[in-house]
Swiss-Prot record:
Its EC number is 5.1.1.1. Residues 196-206 have a biased composition (Polar residues). This is Alanine racemase ungC. InterPro entries: Cys/Met-Metab_PyrdxlP-dep_enz, PyrdxlP-dep_Trfase, PyrdxlP-dep_Trfase_major, PyrdxlP-dep_Trfase_small, Trans-sulfuration_enzymes. GO terms for biological process: transsulfuration. It catalyses: L-alanine = D-alanine. Gene3D superfamilies: Aspartate Aminotransferase, domain 1, Type I PLP-dependent aspartate aminotransferase-like (Major domain). Disruption phenotype: Impairs the production of unguisin A and B which could be restored in the presence of D-Ala.
Length: 586
């Protein structure tokens, strides 16, 4: 490493990357403060869904001043969020209003407004209630949409922006700031009343730059290699792949498309990523949780589905959501059983494969839709946000889902981000194979420390060590050297993330503070990243979550020997605390 991670302070990004997703949260105390909402205000940079990038803040301030000057409607206490699509902006407006009116029925609709912000030669406000061609982002003259809201709704606006992930990227903000410097905007106009009251779900906007088609083809190609032989008879094609500006944006839009197909309370099995859970809880009829994902809980789920069937409930469950494996405890639920339940009761199964990546696991044998954070392993260099949704061509509901997704899709992936993603992902297979091998080596060498009574390490979590190992291995991609194209594919593995639990928080804090790697919210990068996950998310006392001492470790491209030495040095520091306290393993 050119720069020692320990030399970076709170909120400092990975050196040399203007759009880095790796932003340092260096100590255990900083992680706790972040989870309590006390650290973000001190951070000039942060993970894009947690801390607004400085260029986005600068652009937002300029646009807010323009709105105030032009319309005299923006109160001094007003704030705004920026989106690249009108549908996302209107979804944000409706969400903020719903939250505000839930607290005070006297809140008027016009207290939250959407403005069109043009860069380039044209500033005409278009009526978005009708179909129109829109290629500004590809011509270099983008149109943004600003949602203006009162300060009283700041928490609601932040929740929408953080969970649903459709806000503009830092690259798009930089592009707009350059246009501003050239005198090409911004020009501000309010949306027509018809557009402001229209449904957020409308016609699709075209992705005309060839990089989008290339990315879809590449992802579809990786999805061809199934977990079983022979290869799938109905292969994934580029139109089955939908791209988004982030993984959470993909999850949000898939959820909305499913609810348009069947509105009802969703279900999740196994531990679910916190923002995903919040989307299911707050952007629809709600969710039933089976957070442990055990056989007993799946029995309960089966009984619930049967009860709904017998009662003829008009709000039948639309989908079961899960991860493979779950973040951060690396468990895998019985996906074959979920598939059987879905077939029996005509449900969808949606699986997030971000932790394993579709280089390692094939989920199209069990899922109707696979969602992924492309910001992680597919990109691999932690400098671009993106997400995808893959529709299973063998799903009985494929035609309906494809029509719904295509009709409502709105491109939120800026072309410069797409170009970066395409370049980054060229070495995805080889990079993932290397990370798999390094991680398996680290886990094998650390495993015996769990049984050492003098070591405070109490549990090592990794798909190959979990009781659910068989469920994960059942989804691993076929690696036979005799299968077509096998020589160009990586050997599937167990992924690049493992987690460690300790005897107590004092030992965990000592380990974390002495661990010389990058520390922050992301994973799946070319450098190792550690996170005090439960502390960072502020979920210490929530049922069904991970242990409060858990530290998630994402392996990068550094040599295994170097990383093992760093981990062992940190374990020695934790061991000193453990022995000084006279602690014992639980």
């Amino acid at each position: 490493m050119k720069t020692r991670p320990q030399a970076l302070g709170l909120g400092e990004p990975y050196p040399g990357r203007a759009h880095s997703l790796v932003v340092q949260i260096p100590t255990w105390a900083d992680m706790v403060a972040f989870g309590q909402g006390k650290a973000a205000a001190q951070m000039n940079h942060g993970y894009p869904r947690s801390v607004v990038h400085p260029d986005i803040r600068s652009l937002g301030s300029t646009i807010l001043a323009k709105i105030h000057h032009k319309t005299a409607e923006a109160a001094p206490s007003s704030s705004l969020l920026l989106f690249s699509g009108v549908k996302a902006a209107l979804c944000c407006k409706h969400y903020i209003l719903r939250c505000m009116q839930g607290r005070d029925q006297g809140v008027l609709e016009d207290c939250v407004r959407v403005y069109e912000v043009s860069f380039g030669s044209s500033c005409m406000c278009r009526d978005h209630h009708h179909h129109h061609h829109h290629d500004d982002a590809h011509s270099g003259s983008p149109t943004l949409y600003a949602v203006l809201y009162p300060s009283a709704a700041a928490a609601d606006a932040h929740a929408f922006w953080q969970r649903t992930g459709p806000g503009i990227s830092s690259r798009l903000a930089q592009h707009c700031l350059r246009l501003q410097q050239q005198g090409s905007g911004p020009r501000v106009g309010a949306l027509p009343a018809a557009a402001s009251t229209a449904s957020p779900m409308g016609s699709s906007l075209p992705d005309s730059h060839p990089v989008y088609a290339e990315l879809r083809r590449r992802i579809a190609g990786y999805a061809q290699h199934s977990a079983d032989e022979p290869p799938m008879t109905q292969p994934v094609t580029a139109p089955d792949v939908f791209l988004y500006g982030s993984g959470m944006a993909a999850i949000y839009h898939v959820h909305q498309a499913i609810l348009a197909w069947r509105s009802g309370m969703s279900v999740h099995a196994g531990l679910l990523y916190e923002p995903t859970l919040r989307i299911l809880q707050t952007h629809g009829p709600g969710v039933r949780s089976y957070s442990l994902g055990t056989a007993a809980e799946l029995d309960e789920l089966a009984a619930h589905l049967e009860q709904e069937r017998v009662s003829g409930s008009p709000c039948a469950v639309p989908a079961i959501w899960c991860e493979c494996p779950s973040n951060p405890i690396l468990q895998t639920v019985d996906l074959q059983r979920l598939r059987a339940l879905a077939d029996q009761h005509d449900l969808l199964v949606v699986v997030d494969d971000s932790v394993a990546s579709f280089a390692n696991v094939d989920l199209l044998g069990v899922a109707d839709i696979v969602v992924s954070s492309l910001s992680k392993y597919f990109s691999g260099y932690a400098d671009v946000m993106a997400g995808s949704a893959i529709l299973n061509p063998r799903s009985r509901h494929h035609a309906t889902l494809l029509n719904q997704m295509a009709r409502t899709h709105e491109n939120s992936l800026f072309v410069d981000d797409a170009l970066r993603l395409e370049r980054n992902s060229r070495d995805f297979p080889a990079r993932m194979a290397r990370i798999n091998a390094t991680t398996e080596s680290l886990v094998q060498q650390l495993g015996p420390r769990v049984a050492d009574p003098k070591c405070p390490l109490t549990r090592l979590l990794y798909p190959s060590r979990c009781t659910s190992r068989g469920y994960y291995e059942g989804q691993m991609r076929w690696s036979s050297s005799s299968s077509p194209g096998a020589e160009s594919r990586p050997r599937p593995g167990y992924g690049g993330v493992f987690s460690m639990e300790f005897a107590d928080c004092g030992c965990a804090a000592a380990f974390f503070d002495h661990l010389e790697v990058y520390k922050g919210l992301s994973f799946g990068a070319d450098v190792c990243i550690a996170a005090a996950y439960v502390q960072m998310t502020g979920r210490q006392n929530a049922p069904g979550t991970a242990h409060e001492t858990l530290i998630r470790f994402s392996v990068g491209l550094e040599p295994a020997e170097e990383m093992l030495l760093r981990v062992e040095t940190a374990l020695e520091a934790a061991g000193r605390v453990f022995l000084a306290q006279g602690s014992r393993k639980p």
